[in-house]
Amino acid sequence: MSFAANAKKELTQLELVSCCARAELSALIRMNGSLSLGNKQVGLDVTTENAAIARRIYTLIKHLYPNIHIELLVQKKMRLKKNNVYMVRISKEARQLLEDLRILNGSFQFIRDISPEIVKESCCKRAYLRGAFLAGGSINHPETSSYHLEIFSLYEEHNQAICELMNGFSLSAKTLERKKGFITYLKESEKITEFLNIIGAHQALLYFEDVRIMKDMRNSVNRLVNCETANLNKTVGAALRQVENIRFIDKTIGLENLPPKLQEVAKLRVKHQDVTLKELGEMMQGGKVSKSGINHRLRKIDEFADKLRNGTFDAKKLNTHRGK
């Protein structure tokens, strides 16, 4: 079962008071319901591929409208994924329910946004967002490369109302038009965990945070290892270059023609190719030399090698340095 499916399953098991049940059911029916007209009656079908959500819708309707007759149907998809489709059907008397949930008004007109009366209390705002997430929400698994939570709605007015409802909780949600509708989405991991807390998905929140923390730790360790590897490669590369230059000088003019201080560090570098500059400095016979001092001497050796290669080496200048 996916992370999103687990989160939704958790939400369907929450207990509700009547006002919150009404707000949640309003979102579920508005987003997953379809109307039918016949024999002067209004019928309602609410469909979902999630059995737990279908049971939730059935339970909410029974809780709020015990006198309305409900059917729970199961159909098999014959194309593509072949999942079961669960349908909660009200063949008659749906108009009363739709008006009470502020989906239709008294003139039998569809209300495209969210009625303030449905989300009057803070708990009802949370419940409506819970219903909207159950009906049209999706969330990436926290292990994936990017964090993303979204709620899909067919109507721009309703999508904007969902965004405003979310931003009432300081979530910094944004909207985007898609090919077949609109979405309200979150990209920041902290905002996603806040949203999960708001709608009551606390187990999903804890799992999300655990995975996110481990993921951040792995990324930090990888960055540290990469940095240390890069530094090590740089150090090894410099040591190999220094040894190559020292051997080139020894082959062309001989190390004995270098100033004594450079001779000593050159011989130590060839003998101890894998040690650090600090360790080289501690090996000097004339007394400990600082890391910067060793680095300066090795740079001078590199300069001598470069001049020998390009023909600009001046033996007279070398003789003036030999006693140094």
From Swiss-Prot:
Keywords carried by this UniProt record: Cell cycle, Cell division, DNA-binding
Classification via InterPro entries: Homing_endonucl (IPR027434), Sporu_reg_WhiA_N_dom (IPR018478), Sporulation_regulator_WhiA (IPR003802), Sporulation_regulator_WhiA_C (IPR023054), WhiA_LAGLIDADG_dom (IPR039518)
DNA-binding region: 276-310
GO BP term, example: regulation of sporulation
One Pfam family hit: LAGLIDADG_WhiA
Gene3D superfamilies to which the protein is assigned, alphabetical: Homing endonucleases
Database matches in HAMAP family: HTH_type_WhiA (MF_01420)
Recorded family membership: Belongs to the WhiA family.
Protein name: Probable cell division protein WhiA
Species for this entry: Shouchella clausii (strain KSM-K16)
Gene encoding the protein: whiA
